[in-house]
Amino acid sequence: MNGQNIRIRLKAFDHRVLDASTREIVSTAKRTGANVRGPIPLPTRIEKFTVNRSTHIDKKSREQFEMRTHKRLLDIVDPTPQTVDALMKLDLAAGVDVEIKL
């Protein structure tokens, strides 16, 4: 696969699971002879939700919840066919969303 790069974008709510999956992908790619750029940490998306604590009164009493989405970016430069096969067979954690672009 001459001159072609694989860009992998990972998303997860838990950064520990995300980092473990990233390490697993990097070690698999390096083991098969590909060059890896990254992991590059992308900005964390924070969604905040504000709700009333009570159902009817006390508008001043509110509670805030937040949801953090952590992201990482990996570039695999000049992947070998063995690299592609190993990445296809790789089993990652359930809470990690993987987007792959060629």
From Swiss-Prot:
One GO location term (cellular component): ribosome
Keyword Ribonucleoprotein: yes
Alphabetical UniProt keywords: Ribonucleoprotein, Ribosomal protein
GO BP term (any one): translation
Pfam families per record: Ribosomal_S10 (PF00338)
Xref: InterPro entries: Ribosomal_uS10, Ribosomal_uS10_CS, Ribosomal_uS10_dom, Ribosomal_uS10_dom_sf
Cystines in this chain: none
Listed SUPFAM superfamilies: Ribosomal protein S10 (SSF54999)
A GO molecular-function descriptor: structural constituent of ribosome
Database matches in PROSITE patterns: RIBOSOMAL_S10
NCBIfam families: PRK00596.1, rpsJ_bact
Family as reported in the entry's similarity comment: Belongs to the universal ribosomal protein uS10 family.
Subunit record text: Part of the 30S ribosomal subunit.
Entry function: Involved in the binding of tRNA to the ribosomes.
Protein name, as recorded: Small ribosomal subunit protein uS10
Organism: Chelativorans sp. (strain BNC1)
